[in-house]
């Protein structure tokens, strides 16, 4: 058992035109968690983001959707961590992952940024790569020159269905993640996808 999660960050770009795009999958995931927990987001200018609070096992857990655009997400995350004295090991960042097929979700701690500007910004602000990531597969366009256009568009219908199903399953696994029972959470997330 590791430290419980105290901050969940859903990466995405602000504005209606980005809603449900591949790059906003993290933000969309956080909306689903907030709905399941029956909480609403409110803008908090201290953290440059939309925030909500849930309580799990007597622990306050903050939900944060940075409103800074992806490449400045670290400012929002860092501000909240400093204010609430949250360590990097207590953070879960939910983001789109080009290296995973739609419908695949992987949980891991640390690692590189894979070129993801939101992760780069968070790593730069926290001065560490050691935080938890929930990587939601969106697939790859096959040509790195098409990545920017690809992530800023909606997934195809069949991809969206796979992503939705995987998100639903990961929300069911959320209590394990929140408590810091990452081994059990990974087993449930990763084993299901191999079947």
UniProtKB/Swiss-Prot annotation:
Looking up PROSITE patterns in the UniProt record yields: PEPT_TRNA_HYDROL_2
GO terms for cellular component: cytoplasm
Q: Which PANTHER family match?
A: PEPTIDYL-TRNA HYDROLASE (PTHR17224:SF1)
Primary location group: cytoplasm
What is the native source organism of this protein?
Nitrosomonas eutropha (strain DSM 101675 / C91 / Nm57)
Q: Which gene encodes it?
A: pth
Residues annotated as the enzyme's active site: 23
Site, Discriminates between blocked and unblocked aminoacyl-tRNA: residue positions: 13
**Name recorded for this polypeptide:** Peptidyl-tRNA hydrolase
Catalyzed reactions: an N-acyl-L-alpha-aminoacyl-tRNA + H2O = an N-acyl-L-amino acid + a tRNA + H(+)
